[in-house]
Regions:
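Bacterial N-terminal signal peptides that target proteins for export
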Residues: 1-10
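Intrinsically disordered, low-complexity regulatory regions of eukaryotic regulatory proteins
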Residues: 2, 21-24
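Hydrophobic h-region of N-terminal signal peptides that target proteins for export
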Residues: 13-22
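Eukaryotic helix-grip
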Residues: 23-236
Length: 236
């Protein structure tokens, strides 16, 4: 089973596309951000290497959102810079399989990106998506999120330029995530990554949920490891 899980990275940390692309940040995406941000409703399931794993049912959705969280002393600004560094994902997100990530466009507030996820199993198409990521909360009242991202509408003309392989790809268009840094009474923050993504296709829900948990955990651990390396360089 672990070999199968490593080939599916549907929840891989995600991200985007720029001017001229229509966003799918509609009413249901706004509601999804609210559900992810709300600390009520998360059910703890497990803890590994000091990282807690929780899930939460999302109204009207067949799958559950996933949250991983850990206390850390790494400054949130460093973590934020790591997550926004889409162009270098392939260098430090080493545990999520052979994905391809591209930074498409960047402004002072957001970065647009693309990810391609090859699926090495019969009868199951590869996955791809465009996303937009912001270095702040999802609205003016959200003061704890340091990153929020959401998927973008499909644009075939853009996708052909990014991945011209001739295969049956499934485009993912409904998903969002939050990286939150909640202050504590000590010098630590509670860093959490909360995500909901529909991987598309006719896959059993239990299998998708299990794969999503593994993938989100790996993204979280790799991002923290990279942030620690960058912190050590700054301190030197």
């Amino acid at each position: 089973m672990s070999g199968v899980i490593s080939k599916f990275n549907f929840a891989t940390l995600l991200f985007f596309l720029g001017h001229g692309l229509a966003e799918t940040k509609d009413g249901r995406t706004e509601q999804l951000f609210q559900d992810l941000h709300d600390n009520i409703g998360w059910v703890f399931e497990d803890s590994k290497d000091g990282i807690s794993i929780s899930r939460k049912p999302i109204q009207g959705m067949g799958l559950k959102a996933v949250m991983v969280a850990k206390k850390t002393m790494i400054p949130k600004e460093i973590i934020q810079s790591v997550i926004m560094d889409v162009g270098n994902y392939e260098k430090f997100l080493k545990s999520i399989g052979p994905i391809r990530s591209h930074e498409v466009q960047r402004s002072s507030d957001w970065v647009d990106g693309y990810q391609f996820i090859p699926i090495d199993l019969p009868l199951i198409g590869d996955r791809e998506y465009l996303f937009r990521m912001y270095s702040d909360g999802y609205n003016s009242e959200d003061t704890t999120s340091i990153i929020h991202w959401h998927l973008l509408e499909k644009r075939d003309d853009v996708l052909v330029g990014l991945n011209n392989q001739n295969n049956d790809r499934v485009y993912l268009d409904h998903g969002a995530g939050l990286w939150m840094a909640e202050e504590t009474l000590s010098d630590t923050i509670v860093l959490s990554y909360r995500i909901y993504m529909d991987p598309g296709g006719a896959l059993p829900e239990f299998l998708v949920d299990m794969m999503n948990k593994v993938s989100v955990m790996n993204i979280f651990k790799d991002a923290i490891a990279e942030a620690k390396l960058r912190q050590d360089i700054i301190v030197q």
